[in-house]
Amino acid sequence: MTIVAHSHSFVIGVDTHAKSHTYAVIDAANGELLGCQLFPTTAKGMARAIAWAGRLSSGEATTLWSIECIATYGAKLARAVSDAGYEVVEAPRISTKSRRGIGKSDPIDAQAIATATRSLDDDQLRRPRADDGIRQALRVLVAAREQMAQEKTMNTNALTALLRVNDLGIDARKPLTLTQIGEISRWRSREEPIARVVARDEAIRLARQILAFQETLTTNQKRMIELIAQSPAAPLLEEPGVGAYTAAILITAWSHPGRVRSEAAFAALAGVSPIPASSGNTIRHRLNRGGDRRLNRALHVIAMSRMQHHDNTKTYVEKRLTEGRSKREIRRCLKRYLGRHFYR
């Protein structure tokens, strides 16, 4: 295996924060610190930082940038560095033991990142997700959808609780329907005790917010469908049980060529690969509770939908039930199959 010190001329470690980043440039061959500098996170600040690092590294194309928090604080810098033609990786985790007796500061952290990256094998480098084009657009829509769905649920729960405590003429013993919520949103103020007036006004406000979220979620779903239809993954929408949201999660989880090297690796990423837990004469496996839980949840939703509405899947479920398997075990098998199917 080739390590970074042999395959790259220089390594630049970056300790990232909201207002400023600290950059440390080291010689990959011997680990010598060539310079350490702080720059603001503005576009001009990042351009100056890249130019400064380029001068210290003689503009070598084989310079490797190791950036901390590459999906959050370091995202803009990672894009700028990639656009400048350099290779970018996620900074490795620095162990607490390695910091002992050294202390902690931004320059120390930046140098530690560069030094730790220098000793890694090339296949241990964590390359960032692709963050442009359709995949990044879907990632934004997925995050927005999850936030809106959560807020809609919170408002619905608040409205249900309000109607169960205050007699406003709506039967809230069961979950509220959109028809009932629409009716509430059209209520007018009326002559009644002050407590009921306030409760009714609050119910109207919550109902209107719920309907607004519903409309925005519908628009969000349409945007997802349009983007997925334009991507190479468009056939996903034709798969039984796969909707716009679950298809978007499958696409964004994949992120870039090379992240998943095999079908088994994709199953591990999705958290659907059984983990051996055997000892002596006992042979068994336990659930994989790691991996990308959002991707795992998407496969769960698809499996549940197929178990209810897909004829071939229902036939499979009946067969496995006659063999003595439980519904839970069958669902796990289905999720493992789906991981294999979508990888291929």
Regions found by a protein language model. Give the residues of each.
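Short beta-strand-loop/turn "lid" adjacent to the catalytic site in phosphate-handling enzymes
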Residues: 62-79
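Nucleic-acid-processing active sites and adjacent nucleic-acid-binding tracks
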Residues: 29-60, 64
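Glycine-rich, often acidic, oxyanion-interacting loops/wings at catalytic, nucleic-acid
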Residues: 141-234
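Gly/Thr-rich phosphate-binding beta-strand-loop-beta motif of the actin/hexokinase/Hsp70
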Residues: 2-28, 113, 148
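Short, charge-rich amphipathic alpha-helices with coiled-coil/heptad character
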Residues: 119-139, 189-194
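Short alpha-helix plus adjacent loop in nuclease-associated cores
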Residues: 82, 89-128, 179-186, 282-290
